């Protein structure tokens, strides 16, 4: 086991603070509408230009082990805020730096770090409660667009396209961000349910131009096992042929004789059918087949529930207005399912989301809700160069997370104003303990730091602006983008309450841990001897 370097007290705390400052100073320059760019070197390809706080934070590793520990702890603030709210990473980093810097002064002066932390926690709890009180719901497309624009560094086009996407697929809908092919941002909306399985044979294609198989008013057969014997399918195929309608077969797999017969029937025009594999794997496949059954008004034919393929009737089949099957995707448009049953299914999946523990499971369940409830929107980000594309995509993803957070918990005045107004909750907060009161004072000063940084990045004088904003009331603040004072909500400068709350809570949590740190342990790097040069090899004299 390698030897360890163990250090105590103020000296090691100072190293930790140095690490915090290096990381925070790199991140804080990106804050606000006039935030600067940070250029990050990549091992391969061109440099990455970004204004996204968490992207900058993730790139930083420091040489000194103790400084690096401080930097990594603040990186955790940015990452955690990003995971919970999807935005506000720079605000969280600025708050953490401010709380640590203020708190260290008190610790060095001999105050009890544990009481300071208790005071900080009490102040943050009061601020969070006040933020909930001053938040207003975010319902209209205009407000959603404003939140998106602010988060995307005042890019109004990004806000507008996100608002349009939410309008089309609903607030529960799935919105994904992809690389575009043109210079402009584009919105592509898939109505109905889409899953990532395509036709099993290209001979099913009937629209050569689009390279898809399009079925109008089809029946949908759902089976949870493989189909390889055509005899099992014949009774259903005969009933569908009599009805003179096309058929989509969704099964674990369709192979051999069964697939060949379907293809031949399709080519000869006897019966228009398309076969696709069922989406997902294992239990998720069963659940998704059930979703499709409810959406189309059919049942999943499964031996588990006593149904067999040869005894299936038209009543067991689902129906839809139109189904389009491509090479990799199948889209079911306007299923004939009962609206009440679909709603009940959505409610059931939402219940599962509440109890799900892993982010992956939550994401997959959320996708299922979206496919049943609305649809899927894809924002294709356009840019002139690949470097610009990456930077723009970062901002669009930030904006998307911010708008979702705004819909969830409402919005507050942006530009650091909400935190200043929430300070009112601390005026009457007395803990009855001098050290804890000092903790409250630390937070009281720290909540000014986001506004100060926004003003500094815009080239203004922070103290002058903070004093002027404090003289006002309500949503009165400073719009760094235009250099004007006024009502932030009316000017469209909004922040999601969830983002502001998460930033404050995570910053205070990590900063509190740092203040109560008294010992740090790091590995001592071993001095490995250099590898000796290779000696000359016999018989290679002519090459030396």
From Swiss-Prot:
It catalyses: ATP + H2O + a folded polypeptide = ADP + phosphate + an unfolded polypeptide. Its EC number is 5.6.1.7. GO terms for molecular function: ATP binding; ATP-dependent protein folding chaperone; isomerase activity; unfolded protein binding. Its main location: cytoplasm. It is an enzyme of class 5 (isomerase). It is found in: Cytoplasm. Disulfide bonds: none annotated. One of its GO terms (cellular component) is cytoplasm. Keywords: ATP-binding, Chaperone, Cytoplasm, Isomerase, Nucleotide-binding. Forms a cylinder of 14 subunits composed of two heptameric rings stacked back-to-back. Interacts with the co-chaperonin GroES. Together with its co-chaperonin GroES, plays an essential role in assisting protein folding. The GroEL-GroES system forms a nano-cage that allows encapsulation of the non-native substrate proteins and provides a physical environment optimized to promote and accelerate protein folding. Belongs to the chaperonin (HSP60) family. PANTHER family: 60 KDA HEAT SHOCK PROTEIN, MITOCHONDRIAL (PTHR45633). This is Chaperonin GroEL. It comes from Neisseria meningitidis serogroup C (strain 053442). The lineage of its organism: Bacteria, Pseudomonadati, Pseudomonadota, Betaproteobacteria, Neisseriales.
